């Protein structure tokens, strides 16, 4: 086994060790799901960033930069502004509100704030979270197969199986304590990858005389996507839709349950201001760096190379080609870190939706804290295996990580984003308005994503968010008698 493989295995052993070490800290359901609301600003910020930027950032975004080109830069801009908006609009108020209502989850917070005696908010929220997170977690498992295929030349199915097993085991053992503290290290590895790899690539390219502009021009004829155009070769209204489609990635940050739960777990609302600065400082070079990794790989290998090699494997391939094996091993571990950080967080949030919101609260099962924690661990295995099955299916069908993540991101962001923003900032928001927003965001995403004519017109990330926001607003105005 080479040096890269040794470093990778040592890193995975470390993750499992953290899971064993943090097992003893989980005495209550609040400990298991929110780390007892005791996280400091640095851990919170890095955990939010590491779990927010999944394998999508280190695998799918570079792949999109290669095959789509400069028009994907709108997504980079949208993501950065979405992160900033989430920290300013959601973080501090949500931390205060969830403690005020003694809520461990987003469904529970919305239920208690709007005094939903019907339990419809809790039920709808739980279904939405469980449904879309199965796809989202499956994308992370799928990504593990791609990285391990690149690293060890393993069959992708074997890689998916290994990655899924590791994530399920250490999330099962450590809960949110394990997730948050490993996210701190993984966030450091990820930002190191996204800053150093493009710089190393640029130095290599400058010495060879190759340029990004020439490679983008060549990619135009290879991928047929007008790669050298910021608007994909379109003009007028079509160009505007292209830009808005990329920018719409930012809207999802307002409602991703696995991200906003970090705001709920921070030690105090005062720590939010410090964590916000750290997270934004991470995002600016991190998101931009991922896009540059794709462009550097395009120049270094040439567009034709990616007709036979998966563009979503460009980051690990580039790291192995340019860097010392020790550094390459760390950075490829960073790619797996990105996948694990998101998958473990999503497994926890999905589990909380089933055990805390549905079983404990909706069905009214009065269980001890010890039994609730055990039930949560059982659900992690069940949901993890379901996501594993979807990942295997995606690999067999040849689906891209980019598309699966976009679908789940849209569904979660549009269902919860408008509901959370309005609940935190608009006093006229009503219970029925929240229910309408959840339902419209959920259904619009599913319908829009599965009708090619609508999807070709505008992405579901934008349409579903707008319709859900309007639903909350209009229905709330029509039901002011209950506010």
Residue ranges and their predicted role:
Residues 1-483:
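Membrane-embedded helix-loop-helix hairpins and adjacent transmembrane boundary segments
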